[in-house]
Curated annotation (Swiss-Prot):
Binding sites annotated in the UniProt record for Zn(2+): H432, H496
Protein name in the entry: Phosphomethylpyrimidine synthase
The organism's taxonomic lineage, starting at the top: Bacteria, Pseudomonadati, Pseudomonadota, Gammaproteobacteria, Candidatus Palibaumannia
Location of the region described as Disordered in the Swiss-Prot/TrEMBL record: 109-130
Pfam families (UniProt xref): ThiC-associated, ThiC_Rad_SAM
Keywords associated with the record: 4Fe-4S, Iron, Iron-sulfur, Lyase, Metal-binding, S-adenosyl-L-methionine, Thiamine biosynthesis, Zinc
Signal peptide bounds: none
GO cellular component, one term: cytosol
Cited function: Catalyzes the synthesis of the hydroxymethylpyrimidine phosphate (HMP-P) moiety of thiamine from aminoimidazole ribotide (AIR) in a radical S-adenosyl-L-methionine (SAM)-dependent reaction.
NCBIfam families: PRK09284.1, PRK13352.1, thiC
Gene3D superfamilies xrefs: 6.10.250.620, Radical SAM ThiC family, central domain
Keyword Metal-binding: yes
Record note on quaternary structure: Homodimer.
Length: 622
């Protein structure tokens, strides 16, 4: 498409994205925060965290003295973009963090780089790499699962252990370490996550570390039931809208707002080029659905798809560095007929493509037929498989039907095959499921898929709220995360309506970070409650700035507060506009606490209540 034929609104969006890329620098971004690094035993292991600095607590009304509040370290997915000391240049990409570890293992070798041959001749579109991709040396297996089964603790595992503990050893306050036990439905909770624990979980197949050796820019992370619940963000262009600049902007924006992984679901023009820009600039693992690009190669004609074209696409993406593939190998021909009576049929793009191909050719799904070959390729690059739920329900009416669970059983069979090749596996799940039917999805997945990590889209709990499906799905996501789901795929406000923009990405991520964190609290994940306790303490002490800064979205929290009390004095007030100065429950509760401390009262009695007259309360307001 020529630039002159692009609608004006699209040109503006693209220009804004280009300006964002050109001006991008490492930045702490969030107020009163700084980048810190946790040092591992291995000298090259430095784990990034964001540390939120807090204000001291005023003890006494007239400022008799202050008590310090320790800074709160939080998990940070922003990579180099969150470090103001790092120079960012999206045209050269990020630092190749894991390359030193990959080379030290001496079990992979460079291969000729033909990726540049696939790039557009337009220099504005192409990202020219100056390195050769690698693959496993002959006879070697290089997956994190292989290392874990061999008893090897890799630097990636050490990195992850530090990251999952979230720097909580830096906090000495007993108040902040208070936590409810939670209920984890039989999960294996560790009070302190060690590199050995990470190794054991990966070896058992209960967790995966997506880490293609050709994406050394990514920072190690783990997806598993016994770790923090993760969130994936989907980006990617379509045949109708978006550009490379906008997708790179969305990538950076997504990692800033907490995306643990990102999937590039591009289906429009320049799929290869878009993916290269994303990979070279991504500090988080990148997933794809390869069938989309394979279909583009046959000009969208499904019956022209074949195994050779698909395998060529896998190889191309493997050499670029894709960390996990969604493969719809469980959509068997006999299961397709089970969807005929559904209200909404097959709603997965990949699932519908393979279903149509099977029916047109009257043949079994070629992804299923060639699954062992897919595994061999993945083992040579350490690409994880995300076994797609091509028959997931697209409406609450179709939830938990025979087609859905038949496919799930097949995904369990494929999981065992992948493990024979030491390939890491996770299982994708629904979809649209009403609340009372969600738990079965988790229990059946654990049973039939041998506790491989579960990765779900929501699920959406009702179908009546287009424009608010980040809410309808966030409810289901929190619940299934509590039951044991390892990663939640976000849903944006644009779900069912259109391609999400930058702001939609943020809204979807905030909703899903809330859901994931709520699940971690419910499971009793060690250290999950520290930030909540810090927020509650700041709220009770009317430290408004700290309340804003501890929030998932400090900017929105501050904006809402300042809509009614914008003055600087409002940040020092012992009330907000909801209750005002006379009816603030926390202000009154604080007076009661101060009074009991002043009078050394240990228990509440009728005589104590009688003492709480106006003069007593006023004197206690110190």
């Amino acid at each position: 498409m020529s630039r002159s034929s692009i609608p004006a609104s699209r040109r503006v969006s693209r220009a804004k994205a280009q300006a964002f890329m050109d001006s991008l620098t490492g930045s702490s971004y969030f107020p009163n925060s700084r980048r810190i690094y946790l040092q591992g035993k291995t000298p090259s292991v430095h784990v990034p965290m964001r540390e939120i600095k807090l204000h001291p607590t005023l003890i006494g009304k007239n400022g008799e003295h202050y008590e310090d509040n320790q800074p709160i370290p939080v998990y940070d997915t922003s990579g180099p973009y969150g470090d103001p000391t790092i120079a960012i240049n999206v045209r050269t990409g990020l630092n190749r963090l894991r390359e030193i570890w990959i080379l030290a293992r001496q079990d992979s070798e460079p291969i000729s780089n033909n990726n540049n041959d696939r790039q557009s001749s337009d220099k504005q579109l192409s990202f020219t790499t100056n390195y050769n991709p690698r693959r496993a040396s002959y006879g070697r297996c290089i997956t994190q699962l292989h290392y874990a089964r061999a008893g090897i603790i890799t630097p990636e595992m050490e990195f992850i252990a530090l990251r999952e503990n979230m720097g909580r050893e830096r906090i000495s306050s007993n108040v902040l370490h208070q936590q409810h036990l939670g209920s984890n439905f039989g999960a294996k909770k560790a009070d302190h996550i060690t590199a050995e624990f990470v190794r054991q979980e990966v070896a058992a197949g209960r967790a995966i570390i997506p880490s293609n050796i050709n994406h050394p820019e990514s920072e190690p992370m783990i997806i598993g039931r016994n770790f923090l619940v993760k969130v994936n963000a989907n980006i990617g262009n379509s045949a109708v809208t978006s550009s490379i600049e906008e997708e790179v902007e969305k990538l950076v924006w997504a990692t800033r707002w907490g995306a643990d992984t990102v999937m590039d679901l591009s289906t429009g023009s320049y799929i290869h080029e878009t993916r290269e820009w994303i990979l070279r600039n991504s500090p988080v693992p990148i997933g794809t659905v390869p069938i989309y690009q394979a279909l583009e190669k046959v000009n969208g004609v499904i019956e022209n798809l074949n195994w050779d074209i698909f395998y060529e696409t896998l190889l191309e993406q493997a050499n670029q560095g894709v960390d996990y593939f969604t493969i719809h190998a469980g959509v068997l021909k006999r299961y397709v007929l089970l969807t005929a009576s559904r209200l909404t049929g097959i709603v997965s793009r990949g699932g519908s493509i393979m279903a149509q191909w099977s029916l047109v050719h009257n043949q079994e799904n070629f992804l299923y037929e060639h699954f062992s070959e897919i595994c061999k390729l993945c083992a040579a690059y350490d690409i994880a498989l995300s076994l797609g739920d091509g028959l997931r329900p697209g409406s609450v009416q179709d939830a938990n039907d025979e087609a859905q669970f038949s496919e799930l059983h097949t995904l369990g069979e494929l999981t065992k095959i992948a493990w024979e090749y030491d390939v890491q596996v996770m299982i994708e799940g629904p979809g649209h499921i009403p609340l009372h039917m969600i738990e079965r999805n988790m229990t059946d997945q654990l049973k039939y898929c041998h506790e491989a990590p579960f990765y779900t889209l929501g699920p959406l709990t009702t179908d009546i709220a287009p424009g608010y499906d980040h809410f309808t799905s966030g409810i289901g996501a929190a619940l299934i995360g509590w039951f044991g789901c390892a990663m939640l795929c976000y849903v944006t406000p644009k779900e069912h309506l259109g391609l999400p923009n930058k702001e939609d990405v943020k809204q979807g991520l905030i909703a899903y970070k809330i859901a994931a964190h709520a699940a971690d609290l419910a499971k009793g994940h060690p250290g999950a409650q520290i930030r909540d306790n810090a927020m509650s303490k700041a709220r009770f002490e009317f430290r408004w700035e700290d309340q804003f800064n501890l929030a998932l979205d400090p900017f929105t929290a501050r904006m809402y507060h300042d809509e009614t009390i914008p003055q600087t004095a409002g940040k020092l007030a012992n009330f907000c506009s909801m209750c005002g100065p006379k009816f603030c429950s926390m202000k009154l509760s604080k007076k009661i606490r101060n009074y009991t401390n002043m009078k050394n009262i240990k228990t509440i009695s009728n005589s104590f209540m009688n003492k709480l007259d106006n003069s007593g309360i006023k004197n206690a307001d110190r």
